């Protein structure tokens, strides 16, 4: 099982999300703790680092993980738009 870190900026990202969507997002994040690469995850390269994006309806969950340290960092949760993608 992976440890989970959520960036402070994610709290701002989720302020305006309705309760039902927020519950589904939280469920997907819980799944990441056990499987950091579930079906449907897209690998994104930015510079020399790799990030991953998980789709949840109209929302995207951006994260990165370190398998050696068993750590997952949630970077953003955003409604799908042009600025969503890194």
Model-derived regions: residue spans:
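Enriched for short, Lys/Arg-rich terminal
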Residues: 1-5, 9-12, 16, 20-23, ...
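Residue-level recognition of specific faces of alpha-helices
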Residues: 13, 28, 40-43, 73
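Compact soluble domain cores
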Residues: 21-33
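A short, surface-exposed loop/turn module that caps and links secondary-structure elements
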Residues: 30-53
């Amino acid at each position: 099982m992976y440890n989970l870190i959520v960036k402070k900026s994610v709290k701002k990202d989720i302020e305006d999300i309705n309760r039902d969507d927020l519950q589904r997002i939280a469920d997907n994040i819980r799944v990441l703790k056990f499987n950091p690469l579930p079906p449907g995850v897209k690998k994104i390269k930015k510079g020399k680092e790799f990030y991953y994006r998980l789709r949840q309806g109209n929302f995207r969950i951006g994260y990165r993980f370190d398998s050696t340290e068993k750590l997952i960092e949630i970077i953003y949760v955003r409604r799908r738009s042009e600025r969503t993608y890194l």
